From Swiss-Prot:
Residues 1-24 form the signal peptide. This is Defensin-like protein 116. Keywords: Antimicrobial, Disulfide bond, Fungicide, Plant defense, Secreted, Signal. GO terms for biological process: defense response to fungus; killing of cells of another organism. The keyword Protein transport does not apply. Its main location: secreted. Disulfide bonds join 40-80, 46-71, 55-78, 59-79.
């Protein structure tokens, strides 16, 4: 069976279609090109004195593993941000 010109065109178009329909995405929901994503919560780690380590642990357990947390003191909040 010979490979005809029509088969080559169909194969080429199929490859182009498949590669153009592949979407790249981050593993973190809501985090894309804009890397300064941040969300803050009034939760226990910062209120009970666990500090930044407790806040990071909370962010990774409740939102996404690729986040880090820090405590803000105005008022007492745990803020989760994307790692840079």
């Amino acid at each position: 069976m010979a490979i005809t010109k029509n088969m080559l065109v169909v194969l080429l178009l199929t490859i182009i279609f498949v590669t153009s329909s592949v979407h790249c995405s981050d593993s973190a929901l809501g985090i894309g090109i804009k890397e300064d994503w941040e969300v803050c919560f009034s939760i226990d780690p910062c209120l009970t004195g666990e500090g930044t380590l407790g806040c990071t642990k909370w962010c990774r357990n409740h939102i996404n593993l690729s986040l880090v947390g820090y405590c803000r003191t105005d008022p007492e909040h745990c803020c989760c941000v994307a790692e840079k």
